[in-house]
């Protein structure tokens, strides 16, 4: 017996925008509830939503709000997520359980992709995707498999720097996920400008990316398209500094027995400490830049630029 697919709840602004075919950009909530500590999470929410709005698109923060898959958080709901108390980290596999429990769930990249597919959103901005973990190739983020089967444009600064970036890029190729550089010929290093990992595709204008996406979909491709751009140069951190901080953070996590979903927030906090806060400045700036580019792509899609 087949079940009718659920339609996420949307705020009135998002619902009206969907009805008229306006440009929308999905934003994950996990970076706000687990990735960045207060007050930085509040600043991230403001900068990302303002960046999307400034280019003529509508920001849509995704979440499970008291058990309901939600597109767009009103002020009261957003404040609850920014306070972080009792908010779960929810990946795609956890969505149904969070709904059954009536829980507040902050959506990861994988879960946000799933909600985008249900809600009809084609563009999503985040900081960095998950991938293959260093020294543990069996530990692979659910983001990768979700990217392989969910047709959404994902704008990011590459995979998080704590990961095995060469292995992650190889997995994306195996899974049939196109990776397109915007303003770069290399995979960015999240906090760093480059990694030395060459990309096979580069498109520097939102209109070009929109055309490539339409062609991708016209061919019946069901995967996401990953659009990667480096962090702003004025806040980027040299790769050797990031690598040293990451290795020290991984060692600290191992000694502390950190496991599972707690690993990434722990490592990012350790890197923040070891870079004397530079990683937070870079994270905020790249989140804003990615939101802006995603908004420009969403507008280009709606305008149907030839």
From Swiss-Prot:
UniProt keyword Hydrolase present: yes
UniProt keyword terms in alphabetical order: Glycosidase, Hydrolase, Lyase, Manganese, Metal-binding
GO CC terms in record: cytoplasm
Residues annotated as the enzyme's active site: 28 (proton donor), 160 (nucleophile)
EC number: 4.2.1.70
Annotated substrate binding sites: 89, 109, 141-143
Cofactor binding note from Swiss-Prot or TrEMBL: Binds 1 Mn(2+) ion per subunit.
Catalysed reaction, written as an equation: D-ribose 5-phosphate + uracil = psi-UMP + H2O
Pfam families listed in its UniProt record: Indigoidine_A
Function per UniProt: Catalyzes the reversible cleavage of pseudouridine 5'-phosphate (PsiMP) to ribose 5-phosphate and uracil. Functions biologically in the cleavage direction, as part of a pseudouridine degradation pathway.
Name of the protein in question: Pseudouridine-5'-phosphate glycosidase
Native source organism of the sequence: Gemmatimonas aurantiaca (strain DSM 14586 / JCM 11422 / NBRC 100505 / T-27)
Lineage: Bacteria, Pseudomonadati, Gemmatimonadota, Gemmatimonadia, Gemmatimonadales
Gene responsible for this protein: psuG
């Amino acid at each position: 017996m087949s079940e009718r697919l659920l339609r996420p709840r949307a705020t009135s602004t998002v619902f009206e925008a969907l009805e008229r075919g306006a440009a929308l950009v999905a934003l994950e909530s996990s970076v706000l509830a687990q990735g960045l500590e207060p007050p930085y999470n509040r600043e991230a929410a403001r900068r990302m939503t303002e960046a999307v709005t400034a280019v003529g698109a509508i920001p849509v923060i995704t979440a499970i709000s008291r058990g309901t898959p939600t597109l767009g958080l009103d002020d009261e709901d957003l404040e609850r997520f920014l306070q972080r108390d009792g908010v779960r980290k929810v990946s795609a596999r956890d969505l149904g359980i969070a709904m059954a429990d009536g829980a507040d769930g902050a959506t990861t990249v994988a879960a946000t992709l799933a909600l985008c597919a249900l809600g009809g959103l084609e563009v999503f901005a985040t900081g960095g995707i998950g991938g293959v973990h260093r020294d543990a190739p069996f530990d692979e983020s659910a983001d990768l498999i979700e990217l392989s089967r969910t047709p959404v444009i994902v704008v990011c600064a590459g995979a998080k720097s704590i990961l095995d970036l060469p292995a992650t890029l190889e997995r994306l190729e195996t899974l049939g996920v196109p990776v397109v550089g915007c303003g770069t010929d290399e995979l960015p290093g999240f906090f760093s400008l480059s990694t030395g990992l060459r990309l096979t595709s580069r498109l520097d204008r939102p209109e070009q990316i929109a055309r490539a996406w339409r062609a991708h979909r016209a061919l019946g491709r069901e995967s996401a398209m990953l659009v990667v751009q480096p962090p702003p140069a004025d806040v980027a951190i040299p790769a050797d500094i990031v690598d040293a901080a990451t290795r020290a953070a991984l060692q600290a996590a191992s000694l502390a027995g950190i496991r599972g979903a707690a690993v990434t927030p722990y490592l990012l906090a350790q890197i923040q400490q070891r870079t004397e806060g530079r990683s937070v400045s870079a994270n905020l700036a790249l989140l804003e830049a990615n939101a802006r580019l995603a908004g420009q792509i969403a507008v280009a899609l709606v305008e149907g630029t030839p």
